[in-house]
């Protein structure tokens, strides 16, 4: 309920970020999803975009379901996060692009986790390469609206090669 009240006071065309775990997803995943679904619906009605922070890959399918429900062919209202420090993130991003019949909302994050954990890149150089590949893939694909969550100069220079209306 608090999230809906916050959406009511922020200007339309703003973005509201949330996390599944903030809604008790570990205890009640279905209840958390229902609450986020309600917030996404309210946000769309008010013109406020919803960014779902992918603190855990367990929620990717649920995020995709919300994008399918609220995103249109021309505009993304719900965005999910792709953690490019994960070795499988590029494959997941490409799969989502291929199966999306709507405008995919992609928030690209580089991430701080590197190495010594299964499924993560071992070096920052590998993470940078994956992030820059994701920049190229998303910004060159018509049905993707991209948020570049980075301050990395190389990635930002790379993004400037594309039309500004394809990223934020």
Role assignments for model-derived ranges:
Residues 1-168:
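Positively charged, amphipathic and often flexible ligand-engagement surfaces
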């Amino acid at each position: 309920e608090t999230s809906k009240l916050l959406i009511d006071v922020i200007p339309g065309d703003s973005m509201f970020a949330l996390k599944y775990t903030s809604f008790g997803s570990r205890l009640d995943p279905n209840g958390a999803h229902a609450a986020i679904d309600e917030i996404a619906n309210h946000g769309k009605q008010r013109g406020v975009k919803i960014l779902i922070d992918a603190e855990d890959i367990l929620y990717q399918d649920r995020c995709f379901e919300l994008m399918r429900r609220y995103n249109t062919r021309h505009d993304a209202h719900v965005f999910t996060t792709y953690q490019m420090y994960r070795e499988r993130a590029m494959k997941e991003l490409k799969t989502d692009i291929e199966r999306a019949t709507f405008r995919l909302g992609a928030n690209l994050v580089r991430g701080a986790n590197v190495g010594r954990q299964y499924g993560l890149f071992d070096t920052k150089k590998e993470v940078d390469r994956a992030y820059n590949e994701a920049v190229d893939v998303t910004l060159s694909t018509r049905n993707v609206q991209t948020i570049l969550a980075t301050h990395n100069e190389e990635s930002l220079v790379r993004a400037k090669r594309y039309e500004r209306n394809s990223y934020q």
